[in-house]
């Protein structure tokens, strides 16, 4: 965990303690000494989340955190994201998983061609979409 030591000037033992705590929090405390190649895709994603948390960020950015995972591993990462949301962490989540977005968001922004097409509370956006494009997108994700 070089970043917190170098960037934040935190003492190594303190960083190691927080790293172990965050690895436990994301459910891979038993993998403290594992190399990335020894971890599954879901474990690698959760290790990345733990690394980010060690920097004590004000906000976390997730860019399609579950897109390359099989369904079982996907659920592991979703559980961690839901737990972080329940803690009140600020997160910006880019995803095509509308169920995840609805479950963890307090504000949703739907982009089309790089522009904001629609935004608001998840219930409003998902239950009563105003734009044809969002309605089309939601119907295609429900059918999939």
Write out the residue ranges for each language-model feature.
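H-loop/switch region of ABC-family ATPase nucleotide-binding domains
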Residues: 95-96
